[in-house]
Amino acid sequence: MPRPISATIHTAALANNLSVVRRHAAQSKVWAIVKANAYGHGLARVFPGLRGTDGFGLLDLDEAVKLRELGWAGPILLLEGFFRSTDIDVIDRYSLTTAVHNDEQMRMLETARLSKPVNVQLKMNSGMNRLGYTPEKYRAAWERARACPGIGQITLMTHFSDADGERGVAEQMATFERGAQGIAGARSFANSAAVLWHPSAHFDWVRPGIMLYGASPSGRAADIADRGLKPTMTLASELIAVQTLAKGQAVGYGSMFVAEDTMRIGVVACGYADGYPRIAPEGTPVVVDGVRTRIVGRVSMDMLTVDLTPVPQAGVGARVELWGETLPIDDVAARCMTVGYELMCAVAPRVPVRAE
């Protein structure tokens, strides 16, 4: 019999979250971002819940082909573009849209032999300083793209670095306007944070990612509490043992936690080999039998231990939610000095996953 740990993907929550995007950006089309195997959820598992989108955005050609095989006939955007000239053959065959962010990609499109023009998103580096043409070079890149017979529609694209923070988007939007002055075309700027908090950045296409999965772009669950988003992944397990610690006794590697009084602890079938962060400190929240409690001791490879003081009735077999419908993933991530994105993507292959 398998270990009791499992992850559940909530299809209805995905559809709900897409509808929240549309409420916030009612005049925009939506690229549903499903990179990194749909933020660890599984591309095939999220497809039924997100198929109401206008397009999908991702990184890998293999995942783009998989979407076509799942029956998706609409737009698919390669967010980092392509890396070799042979990739363009796949782009052409499967009618993909690609980002273009450097001269080497432009050169490959100029020399490609295509059955039809490729739609592109011409990316400006407006301040993130990762990918994209500088504002000073953007017009020349746009003119070059317009002159290329292998390029069809050109969408103007940039990416925000601080849409979830105090700096916001105004500075980058102003930078973009300077670099793209006089250039007409559809625009795609807004990530999840901009969808939620910066309506002036919505334009023609929005690119929500983390909000589709029910977590906060800021990493703070309170920031999205009133937005109607629902968690799309629940990681759950069970108690596989219960121990009673006497005052002064410790639990786990390194004896990191010492009981201040007699107490019951539960042993949970979940550890860092399942993708749960080893760095999780004492006090990281968990939910046992519907009651919120805390981790005590160090997370080990296959197990972690929890305080059963708030839930005295819990015994072997009691359900434990590590994050999900009852416990926001952002609350767990915050205690672990990380973000919900990372926890979702880190769920290990050995954890059974099902969609409902």
UniProtKB/Swiss-Prot annotation:
This is Alanine racemase. The gene is alr. It catalyses: L-alanine = D-alanine. One of its GO terms (cellular component) is cytosol. Keywords: Isomerase, Pyridoxal phosphate. Coiled coil: none annotated. One of its GO terms (biological process) is D-alanine biosynthetic process. Pathway: Amino-acid biosynthesis; D-alanine biosynthesis; D-alanine from L-alanine: step 1/1. The modification N6-(pyridoxal phosphate)lysine is found at residue 35.
